[in-house]
């Protein structure tokens, strides 16, 4: 079954589903800057657009474009910002 999630007053929306290997969400982040928390390891892949992130323990922001991925450990938080709508796929575990 699909579960729709909405965060930051509707500026981030995702649909949760079970991929062939791991639980996942696919969603869109609207222009802005956000801070996300993780409960378990997440691998985030940019599908369309560009996402600039500040990963835990890092001092420099990194930019990821379509087809690029980054990982965040569980029980952590990271910041993300974008200038335009950006689509992503996130797998958990």
UniProtKB/Swiss-Prot annotation:
Gene3D superfamilies: Jelly Rolls. InterPro entries: Ppnp, RmlC-like_jellyroll, RmlC_Cupin_sf. It catalyses: a purine D-ribonucleoside + phosphate = a purine nucleobase + alpha-D-ribose 1-phosphate; adenosine + phosphate = alpha-D-ribose 1-phosphate + adenine; cytidine + phosphate = cytosine + alpha-D-ribose 1-phosphate; guanosine + phosphate = alpha-D-ribose 1-phosphate + guanine. Pfam families: Ppnp. SUPFAM superfamilies: RmlC-like cupins. Catalyzes the phosphorolysis of diverse nucleosides, yielding D-ribose 1-phosphate and the respective free bases. Can use uridine, adenosine, guanosine, cytidine, thymidine, inosine and xanthosine as substrates. Also catalyzes the reverse reactions. This is Pyrimidine/purine nucleoside phosphorylase. It comes from Marinobacter nauticus (strain ATCC 700491 / DSM 11845 / VT8) (Marinobacter aquaeolei).
């Amino acid at each position: 079954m699909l579960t729709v999630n909405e965060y930051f007053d509707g500026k981030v929306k995702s649909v949760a589903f079970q991929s062939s290997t791991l639980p996942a969400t696919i969603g869109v982040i609207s222009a802005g800057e956000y801070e996300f928390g993780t409960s378990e390891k997440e691998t985030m892949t940019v599908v369309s657009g560009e996402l600039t992130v500040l990963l835990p323990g890092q001092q420099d922001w990194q930019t990821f474009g379509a087809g690029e991925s980054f990982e965040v450990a569980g029980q952590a938080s990271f910041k993300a910002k974008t200038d335009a709508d950006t689509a992503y796929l996130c797998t958990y575990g």
